[in-house]
From Swiss-Prot:
InterPro entries linked: QueC (IPR018317), Rossmann-like_a/b/a_fold (IPR014729)
Cofactor: Zn(2+)
Pathway entry: Purine metabolism; 7-cyano-7-deazaguanine biosynthesis
Originating species: Desulfotalea psychrophila (strain LSv54 / DSM 12343)
Superkingdom: Bacteria
Coiled coil: none
Protein name: 7-cyano-7-deazaguanine synthase
Function description: Catalyzes the ATP-dependent conversion of 7-carboxy-7-deazaguanine (CDG) to 7-cyano-7-deazaguanine (preQ(0)).
Gene Ontology terms describing biological process: queuosine biosynthetic process
Catalysed reaction equations from the record: 7-carboxy-7-deazaguanine + NH4(+) + ATP = 7-cyano-7-deazaguanine + ADP + phosphate + H2O + H(+)
Binding residue positions for Zn(2+): C185, C193, C196, C199
EC number: 6.3.4.20
Free-text comment on the cofactor: Binds 1 zinc ion per subunit.
Top-rank EC class of the record's enzyme: ligase
Length: 219
């Protein structure tokens, strides 16, 4: 039996969520998904490393059908990842159809199986503009569906839903989280590219202009 199942991508948001959950004294396991994204090969090792550091059980679930059947520039074989800010129309190409719904459903089933009372996802207020399955309306409806579908045994929670990514970065710093052990860049190169929307957001969140960001960028 465990308190929480954390959906851990290996990115900064879910890493902070993991650290904060453990600081609260909860027991936790992490679940990650290999769904064929261009940055899975960079993110997943970060997730593995975080779980080893925090000494928690970690499951990686392979979802090859997403890469095979779905269309998104975020997926291997998709069009090129666009540069620019999240607010731009072209960033909608990075939406992976119903990704969070699929992952949360699996996490909820796993949580019920191991008698964990909650599933935690690190989506934040800045995700809402582009990604339909990060919006409060979706989160609330899906949480209710899981509550009904598990007969009240599993709650889906979004602790950072009212926070900005910068808020999350600041919280992680108070937790002494090493952000060099997290991955954000959508392009999945050896280093963070520094120009895609995800990198732009990371730079702002980690206060790069103030010299507080430990990330190594190409640009």
């Amino acid at each position: 039996m465990v308190d929480s199942i954390i959906v851990l991508s290996g990115g900064m948001d879910s890493a902070v969520l993991l650290a904060q959950t453990l600081k609260e004294g909860k027991t936790a396991q992490a679940i990650s998904f290999d769904y064929g994204s261009k940055h899975n090969d960079r993110e997943l090792p970060m997730a593995v490393g975080l779980c080893e550091e925090f000494a928690i059980k970690h499951q990686i679930i392979k979802l090859p059908f997403i890469g095979e059947l779905f269309s998104s520039s975020l997926l291997t074989g998709g069009e090129e990842i666009p540069d620019g800010a999240y607010g731009q129309e072209n960033m909608k190409s990075t939406v992976v159809p119903f990704r969070n719904g699929i992952m949360l459903a699996i996490a909820a089933g796993y949580a019920e199986s191991v008698q964990a009372g909650e599933v935690l996802l690190g989506s934040h207020s800045g995700d809402h503009h582009i990604y339909p399955d990060c919006r409060p309306e979706f989160n609330n409806a899906f949480a209710e569906a899981v509550n009904l579908g598990t007969d009240g045994q599993v709650a889906i929670r979004f602790p950072f839903s009212e926070m900005t990514k910068r808020d999350i970065g600041d919280l992680g710093r108070t937790l002494d989280l090493d952000f060099a052990k997290t991955w954000t860049c959508y392009k999945g190169g050896e280093l963070h590219c520094g120009v895609c929307a995800a990198c732009d957001e990371r730079k702002e969140a980690l206060r790069h202009p103030e010299g507080l960001d430990v990330t190594k960028y190409l640009v």
